[in-house]
């Protein structure tokens, strides 16, 4: 989740106004792979912000899409030569290999279009098939000042959560060797100081729960997952001790993506092997596989307790990360992730990732070197639990992808604040696709390229949009409602972000289509099969939704990616409820303070109790207004996710939370005073009935707002 509160507020307004379907009835694009998880607390990466294009200075911002470094044969840009059509309608049969020239022309068109549209500084791509590198190419710039082009053989991109796949390979090697059991409690393989606490749950978290992301942890990241100031960097041991997430459900219940869980897996492997994690990965995977331009280490000065730095020859070739602004590309500081290295600290080149995909497609063997055995190879192609048709599962840590044409693959997506990457291998095509971008707006390209390649060459054409269903219109109430994702923080200030951005509103429109709306936008779906089964497919692609039904009503649903479950949520967790109460509270508070100056004091009478109650309510009004203003100031700075991630929670949000806490506490006092307020009704020196009614309504409004803020974690400034 890119935590832009602008997007959050836009989502809330959308929820308040009602769901609006996107214009998906246009000519359908090639079906993209569902957006994958990123190593920070986002449920999904938010949509690309719409920003005006800016003129580029010649030396500082060269047009990234205009330059490419390639090892594949050149072809006319944007021209895809015609291929014969197979009986299925696909351009190639499964046994046929991709023509390099046609593939390069197609990828060139997709990448350069995305770079121009989304303002991406640099992209690196590699495609392998049947043991050969079919395409290896760099586009744009790894650095804009000084200018340095992307070299697919030398330029390292941060691959984010793709790092986890190396962790799962290391873990499966220990399982194959018999030193770790997949069904054993994780605590057996952790030092006592890092062992998972019960926290009220009797069932222990097992190794397999880490591999399918079902340990039952909440997901927290703000203020600690990334670090830009190396002086604040901690060892992995220290990080895992200090940033323990709460256990919010029993292990094995549902998959809910967990960076902390992946880090525990890496720590377990390190503890059992007796080697530091970075060295273990180098000795057991990277060096034997010939991946000499890949590293989990990071550039930094020597520091006690921190793994050694990345070799200088590699550090000099790491790409810069960028953010697009109206004035041009803005370079990001280096993102340190070494404290949770198994979850996301790897950097690699397109060439090395090509070797890695060949390793995965060849069952753990490359150039005669066996990195992992047949047991692990089979595990990475076998889902750990059954999922509904079209919903991705977990293949012992690897993501199972549903691709166009009914094909499946496995791999992983990844992202940092600036880098967006994806790697997908498709065994029945002998195909692997890797792509990484160095700008925060590169998510659409990264998540969609592999699916576009498969769809372009190996899937028959489809007719879109799919028509709606009259039966769905009749059963709309069974599905409509507000659903909240399980991948979020459950307490404290960080829960604000999860509640504000992690929900989805489900409606049925007049054309018999299911419409899902969240802060990323809206999508439309139609039933696939019997409505009682709760399966839906996109009106314009191959993406699926699967609802869990009970007593004829939807209880929850899973998106195509399957990294979390969306459960029906009460109205108090709906952002529209919080927004409505916030507006009403602001109006009431302003009216209360205005009343101090507008009332005619010569005609105003009140009892001592009413005088004290009025004073308390005036203080409350000032606190509520201060809280709302400070929250607005905090929100105004969140257009850049770095401000949220590195500056969490920040003084504005902290003071706003403290004001809300005091105001909520004073609400208890005014509630207790309500009976005494009304008992003074017949005295001359008492409030009028209208004044008493206004006071009472305001008390009840403040009380409702305080209760909702408690559910949202706003009343705990100490737990940022």
Describe the residue ranges of each PLM region.
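Bacterial N-terminal signal peptides that target proteins for export
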Residues: 1-9
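Bacterial N-terminal signal peptides
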Residues: 8-19
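Compositionally biased, proline/threonine/alanine/serine-rich low-complexity intrinsically disordered stretches
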Residues: 23-99
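Soluble extramembrane regions of membrane proteins in the secretory/endomembrane system
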Residues: 46-69, 74, 79-81, 160, ...
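Short, conserved catalytic-motif segment at the N-terminal edge
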Residues: 96-157, 179-181, 192-195, 232, ...
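Active-site SXXK
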Residues: 105-111, 125, 131, 157-183, ...
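Short, surface-exposed loop or secondary-structure junction motifs
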Residues: 139-143, 198-427, 453
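Peripheral terminal and inter-domain segments
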Residues: 445-720
């Amino acid at each position: 989740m890119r935590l832009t509160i602008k997007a959050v507020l836009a989502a809330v307004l959308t929820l308040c106004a009602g769901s609006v379907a996107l214009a998906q009835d246009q000519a359908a694009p090639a079906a993209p792979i569902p957006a994958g998880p990123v190593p920070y607390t986002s449920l999904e990466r938010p949509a690309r912000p719409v920003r005006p294009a800016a003129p580029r200075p010649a030396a500082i911002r060269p047009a990234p899409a205009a330059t490419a470094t390639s090892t594949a044969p050149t072809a006319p840009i944007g021209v895809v030569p015609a291929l014969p059509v197979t009986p299925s309608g696909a351009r190639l049969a499964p046994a046929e290999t991709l023509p390099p020239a046609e593939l390069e022309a197609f990828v060139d068109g997709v990448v350069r279009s995305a770079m121009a549209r989304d303002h991406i500084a640099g992209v690196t791509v590699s495609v392998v098939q049947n043991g050969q590198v079919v395409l290896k190419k760099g586009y744009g710039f790894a650095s804009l000042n000084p200018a340095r082009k992307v070299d697919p053989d030398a330029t390292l991109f941060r691959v984010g959560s793709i790092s986890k796949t190396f962790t799962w390979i290391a873990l499966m090697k220990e399982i194959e060797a018999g030193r770790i059991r997949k069904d054993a409690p994780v605590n057996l393989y952790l030092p006592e100081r890092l062992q998972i606490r019960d926290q009220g749950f009797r069932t222990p978290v097992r190794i397999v729960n880490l591999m399918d992301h079902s340990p039952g942890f909440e997901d927290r990241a703000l203020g600690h997952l990334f670090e830009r100031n190396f002086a604040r960097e901690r060892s992995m041991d220290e990080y895992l001790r200090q940033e323990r997430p709460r256990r919010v459900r029993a292990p094995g219940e549902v998959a809910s993506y967990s960076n902390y869980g992946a880090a525990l897996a890496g720590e377990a492997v390190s503890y059992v092997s007796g080697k530091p994690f970075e060295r273990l990965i180098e000795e057991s995977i990277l060096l034997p596989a010939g991946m000499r331009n890949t590293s989990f280490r990071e550039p930094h000065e020597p520091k006690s307790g921190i793994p050694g730095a990345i070799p200088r020859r590699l550090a000099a070739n790491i790409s810069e990360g960028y953010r697009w602004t109206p004035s041009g590309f803005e370079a990001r500081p280096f993102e340190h992730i070494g404290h949770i290295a198994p979850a996301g600290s790897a950097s690699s080149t397109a060439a090395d990732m090509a070797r890695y995909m060949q390793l995965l497609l060849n069952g753990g063997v490359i150039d005669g070197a066996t990195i992992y055995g047949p047991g692990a190879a089979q595990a990475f192609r076998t889902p750990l639990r059954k999922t509904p048709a079209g919903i991705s599962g977990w293949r012992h840590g690897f993501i199972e992808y549903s691709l166009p044409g009914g094909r499946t693959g496995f791999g992983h997506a990844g992202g940092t604040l600036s880098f967006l990457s994806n790697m997908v291998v498709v065994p029945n095509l002998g195909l692997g696709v890797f792509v990484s971008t160095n700008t925060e707006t590169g998510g659409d390209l990264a998540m969609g390229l592999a699916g576009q390649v498969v769809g372009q060459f190996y899937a028959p054409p489809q007719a879109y949009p799919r028509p709606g269903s009259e039966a769905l219109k009749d059963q709309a109430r069974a599905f409509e409602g507000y659903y909240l994702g399980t991948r979020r923080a459950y307490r404290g200030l960080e829960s604000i972000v999860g509640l504000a951005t992690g929900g989805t509103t489900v409606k049925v429109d007049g054309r018999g289509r299911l419409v899902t709306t969240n802060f990323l936008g809206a999508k439309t779906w139609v039933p696939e099969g019997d409505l009682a089964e709760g399966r839906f497919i996109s009106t314009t692609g191959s993406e699926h939704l699967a609802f869990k039904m009970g007593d004829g009503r939807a209880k929850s649903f899973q998106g195509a990616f399957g990294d979390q479950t969306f459960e029906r949520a009460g109205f108090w967790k709906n952002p529209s409820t919080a927004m409505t109460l916030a507006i009403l509270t602001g109006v009431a508070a302003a009216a209360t303070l205005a009343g101090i100056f507008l009332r005619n004091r010569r005609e105003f009478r009140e009892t001592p109790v009413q005088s004290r109650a009025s004073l308390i309510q005036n203080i409350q009004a000032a606190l509520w207004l201060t809280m709302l203003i400070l929250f607005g100031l905090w929100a105004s700075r969140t257009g850049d996710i770095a401000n949220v991630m590195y500056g969490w929670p920040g003084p504005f949000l902290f003071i706003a939370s403290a004001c809300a806490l005091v105001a909520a506490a004073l609400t208890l006092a005014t509630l207790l005073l309500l009976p005494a307020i009304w008992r003074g009704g017949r005295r001359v020196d008492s409030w009028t009935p209208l004044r008493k009614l206004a006071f009472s309504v305001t008390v009840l409004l403040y009380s409702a707002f305080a209760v909702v803020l408690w559910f949202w974690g706003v009343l705990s400034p100490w737990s940022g």
